[in-house]
Every structure is written in structure tokens, then in C-alpha cells.
Amino acid sequence: MLRPQGFRNYMVGKWHVTPLTQSGPAGPYDGWPLGRGFDRFYGFMDAETDQYAPELVRDNTPCDPPGRFADGYHLTSDLIDQSIRFIADHSADRPDIPWLTWVALGACHAPHQAPQDIIMSYDAAFAHGWEASQEAGQEGSQDPGQEPGEPDGDVEARLRPVTP
């Protein structure tokens, strides 16, 4: 859609548009990003991938991630780096041509994996166990003066006109 208007189009991240039977290294490639109007692609073809050891594709070619878990690699940082690289390359090569960079990060999808230091930062919050943490969260979410288990009239009133 933008290519006929003179745009260069770059896509980074989750594609998940091509059927699994057509997303392997042998193609066919017409449903891949380059076959759908993008000039460059770096990311993964399926709905999800390991955030530390992803199955990546550069343009139409499978490629290894540029780092490893042991070295601090995480897919989100890699995708941002590749986005910046596409934009920098475009600016150096074709600064007068408009461009689109579509970034679809994968960390919001399964598998949900966080860096170990972030996981460990929550240890104190859950030191008393999951149930105690859940109860504390529920208590903090209620209006002052509302009894546990008492319905929230304001929410019910707002939802009443909603028809499923």
C-alpha cells in the first residue's frame, strides 16, 4: 500500500500472518514480509518464539540470533537494535525517501520470559507466598469502606448497558 506512494517499508518482529505450512525455510515466500510489500524483514514467522533463543529470519533467510542467553541476549533488545539499524541504513542510503518501520515485539506473547534480575526483584513481594500476595493485592484494589465480597456498584452500573 505504501510502496506505490514511494515509501521504503521495513518490518521487525512477529510476523504470524503466513500459515505454518508455508513459513518454513523452503517457503513459498509470497506470504512472507518481502512478498507482502516490505523491503527488509528481521524477526520470527510464527506466533511465538523463545525470547533467549529465537528462530529468526532476515529477509527470506533463516539466521541465528546475534547473542546467547549466557551473554545477556534478549529478543526485545535485538529487535530494537535491528529497527535502529534499518532506519540508520535508510537515512544513510535514501534520506529523501519516506519510510515506514513496523515493529511487532514478541515479549508480550508466550512464552513469557523475563530477565533473571527482573524476576529476582519481585522475590521480596512474594516472600510470604502466592496466596498472601494475592490477598494483599485484592485488599488494595477495593474502595475504602467496601466489605470483602461486596459488589462494586459503580462498576455494575457501568456494565449494565453492555450486552454480550
Describe the residue ranges of each PLM region.
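Formylglycine-dependent sulfatase
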Residues: 1-164
